[in-house]
Design a protein with these regions (language model features):
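Glutamate identity and glutamate-enriched acidic tracts
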Residues: 34, 39, 45, 56, ...
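C-terminal cap/substrate-recognition subdomain and adjoining C-terminal extension
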Residues: 1-14, 86, 93-233
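Amphipathic alpha-helical interaction elements
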Residues: 24, 60, 73-77, 130-134, ...
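Acidic/polar active-site rim loop that often engages polyanionic ligands
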Residues: 29-32, 68-69, 150-157
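Active-site neighborhood of HAD-like aspartate-dependent phosphohydrolases
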Residues: 2-60
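A metal-dependent, Asp-based hydrolase signature
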Residues: 28-29, 41-110
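Amphipathic alpha-helical segments within well-ordered protein domains
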Residues: 33-34, 73, 206
Length: 233
């Protein structure tokens, strides 16, 4: 079914992909927090329950973009990208790569074969998701950006617009401008997402495709006659 969606239109265009719960069977931020707890970097008592709470409220569309971004940005505070990279790379190999299924890779490959420009757009920060985009073979990434101190360490805060909800639409519009692409490209795009948090962007594209949704997004898809596919089978 996913390949049919990818080949439905002949002309190349933007193919936008959410990451967590869409191409990835899991949530990068949640898995990162769990990984750091298991590694002894984060305190289980302090972060374990809070991680689950933020994840559950995010899934229900109840957590604010600022709260979501601040909680997970804080897990990286005090170290530089260079200092974090060995642990980050091991995390991607152990916790992320096995959760990217054949159906997700086939969908991305179908759009690539069609000549579409592939963009991964995610609320998760760029530091964690850049190697995941590379793993998927997606060159363009729009992600939440982390603030870096003059010393080169992450401050534990984000900078700019959090790439979540309406922020995803705003960030993509800015990305189109930066890339010299027409603003109308967004209205002609395809976007794949599992999350009710992505409703603003799903409504902004020509071809919204709902992937393994929860009940709220499934109801929206049914009401709007959007296609629903599964990448988990």
């Amino acid at each position: 079914m996913s390949a049919d969606v990818a080949t439905a239109a002949a002309a190349p265009r933007l193919a936008l992909f959410d990451l967590d719960g869409t191409l990835l069977a899991g949530d990068t931020d949640v898995l990162w927090c769990e990984f750091l707890i298991d590694e002894g970097v984060l305190d289980r008592e302090t972060f374990g329950a809070a991680n689950r709470d933020v994840a559950e409220r995010y899934g229900r569309g109840e957590v604010t973009p600022a709260e979501f971004a601040a909680f997970y940005a804080a897990t990286l505070a005090g170290r530089s990208a260079e200092q974090w990279s060995p642990l980050r790379d091991r995390f991607v190999a152990i916790a992320i790569a096995p959760r990217i299924g054949a159906a997700s890779l086939a969908l991305v490959a179908a759009h690539r074969a069609r000549g579409d420009r592939l963009v991964l757009t995610t609320a998760t920060n760029r530091f964690l998701t850049a190697p995941i985009a590379a793993l998927l073979g997606i060159a363009d990434l729009v992600a939440t950006e982390l603030e870096v101190a003059p010393t080169g360490t992450f401050t534990g805060r984000t900078t700019g617009t959090v790439n979540m909800r309406e922020g995803k639409v705003a960030r993509l519009a800015r990305w189109l401008s930066d890339e010299g692409l027409a603003a109308s490209s967004l209205a002609e795009a395809t976007f794949y997402s599992d999350s009710i948090n992505d409703l603003p962007l799903l409504c902004a594209v020509a071809t919204p495709v709902v992937v393994d949704p929860d009940s709220r997004l499934r109801a929206e898809a049914s009401r709007r006659a959007w296609p629903v596919i599964s990448l988990l089978a």
